[in-house]
Structures are given as C-alpha cells and as structure tokens.
Amino acid sequence: RDRRAGRDLTDVRVRGMTKLSENPPNSAPTLGRSVDWDVAASVGARLTRPAPPVTEYTRAQVIDELSAASRAAEPPVREVTGLHAEGPVPDARIVDRPQWIAPAALSMRAMTGGDAEAGGEPQHPFAAVTGKVAGAQTGAVLSFVSSGILGQYDPLGGDDGILLLVYPNVIAVERQLRVTPRDFRLWVCLHEVTHRVQFTANPWLAQHMS
C-alpha cells in the first residue's frame, strides 16, 4: 500500500491490466505480420546449399527407407510412451532442402502471428519495403537451417500436421558419422515420430503454439 497517497498500488496495477485486456487480441502488430513470407520462402529456396552428390539409386533408396521407417516407428513410440492417437499412421513427406523451406515458412508465419488479421491498425507507409527486407532476412535464416535439419514434425502443417524428413541431410550426416544408413534412418524417424505422437495425442498443443 502507498501510505503517502493513501491507495493500494496492487489495485492500480490490476486496473491497468484489466484496461489493457479490453483491447482486441489482434489490435497490436505482430512479428509475423511484419514479414513478407512469400519473399522469405522464395529467398530461402534460392539460397539453399547444394545437396551432397548421390546416384539416382541412392536417392530412391533413402526416400523409400525413410518412408517405411516413419511408418514402422509409430507403433513402438505409442507403446513406450503410452500416448495413443486416433486413425491410421500418416505418411511422412520426404523432401529435399528447397522443398523444406515452404512449409517451414508457413509454420513460422503461423507461430509468429502472421496469419492474424490486421485489426485495423494504420499501415506504415514503408511497410511493403520493410516487409520484403524482413522476408529476405528470414529466408536467409531458413536456408541456413535447411542444410542441417534432419526432420521436423510440423503440427500446423495441413489439417492434421505433417512429418517432414529432409533426405539430403540424412545422407550427409550418416556419411559424416560413418554409421549404418538403415539404423540411422530409423533413429531419425523414431525421434521425429515421437514429436508427432506427442502432438496428435494432445491436440491442444498445436492450438497453443498457434
């Protein structure tokens, strides 16, 4: 209590918070709305590093093995974790580095409020320019990440989420570590499928992230 003013400071803070909460949730600008996400996806795809050289046979083999491993990993993950999701095991999407960029940009856009409505706030006269600059910077970050990420479960992708496996990076890491390819690919899938099971068994998690 503020004895000099004869009032309770706690009440003042509560009243201030209550007043702020009356504002519409989308009335303030969000980070996501300051980025041109089309530019981010385009720049990111253009800047991706070349994939490790592989024969067409190896490329087809790793895609087939990752696809099969992503399905095989689901039952043991459900059994060990005790988490169960309704419906059949969904197929993973096996992608290269540029193909990973677009869904990653969409996911980042959703998580940063880029899908929120503008709420009527006045647009800055240079918003289009700054949005493209921010988009180019974001695209550069995505291109950097695209050369190292092995897989990702995106709970905001599509209607039911999507599991992405970046096969050039899987090849690069298994060569670097000199591990058995089949075992390493299964390990990657076990890790990423665990995230998928976490989200599909608890739908509120995706809603919380968005």
Regions found by a protein language model. Give the residues of each.
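Short pre-active-site segment immediately N-terminal to the catalytic Zn-binding motif
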Residues: I171-V188
